[in-house]
């Protein structure tokens, strides 16, 4: 494993992968599915405090779903995602396409049975550069026009901008579907 994972718990490793905005995170109270779109509904809110190991533990244990804003206070990102809201989605075919194109991506099932396709980076990069690269990759995969995270290329910290969060994978890691 990379040096920054050595000696860390699974929760700490997960938190290291999903670094982003430090001063707030998203929370979701899961509701019913929309009958027409099949998108999972729920009540989303911003929790205006830093994430902790306990926050990530609760997510992984299936107690409280959380989301992270990929862009940090310095307008840098170490991960991003392509949000594919297509139902039904053939996840196996998508993974095969990623493998065929030899793209360094991780495909995860979203809460609505779409996909979040993650790109993790070794070092932080400008949000704008990551966003442009993910748009290019989405088009290459045949999903041009999908939502891209980070959604913002710049946060004005002095104004209190928080950006948009993405729900993290592995909610209820032992018994969940994502």
Enumerate the language-model features and the residues they cover.
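DNA replication initiation modules
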Residues: 59-95, 100, 121-178
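DNA replication initiation on ssDNA origins
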Residues: 2-79, 88-95, 164-165, 170-175
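Short, conserved phosphate-binding/catalytic loop or strand-edge motifs used
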Residues: 107-116
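Short, structured coil/loop segments at alpha-helix boundaries
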Residues: 7, 109, 138-139
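Residue-level signal for beta-strand positions within conserved beta-sheet cores that form or flank
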Residues: 103, 113, 164
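Broad hydrophobic/π-residue packing in well-ordered secondary structure
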Residues: 24, 115-121
């Amino acid at each position: 494993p990379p040096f920054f994972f050595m000696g860390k718990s699974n929760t700490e490793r997960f938190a290291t992968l999903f670094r982003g905005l430090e001063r707030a995170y998203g929370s979701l109270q899961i509701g019913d599915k929309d009958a027409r779109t099949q998108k999972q509904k729920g009540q989303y809110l911003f929790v205006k405090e830093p994430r902790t190991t306990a926050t990530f533990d609760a997510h992984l244990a299936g107690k409280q779903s959380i989301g992270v804003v990929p862009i940090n206070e310095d307008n840098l990102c170490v991960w991003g995602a392509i949000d594919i809201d297509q139902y039904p989605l053939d996840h196996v075919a998508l993974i095969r396409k990623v493998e065929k194109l030899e793209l360094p991506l991780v495909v995860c099932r979203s809460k609505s049975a779409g996909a979040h396709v993650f790109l993790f980076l070794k070092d932080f990069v400008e949000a704008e550069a990551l966003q442009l690269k993910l748009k290019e990759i989405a088009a290459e995969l045949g999903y041009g026009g999908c939502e891209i995270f980070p959604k913002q290329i710049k946060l004005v910290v002095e104004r209190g901008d928080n950006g948009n969060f993405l729900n993290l994978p592995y909610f209820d890691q032992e018994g969940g579907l994502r």
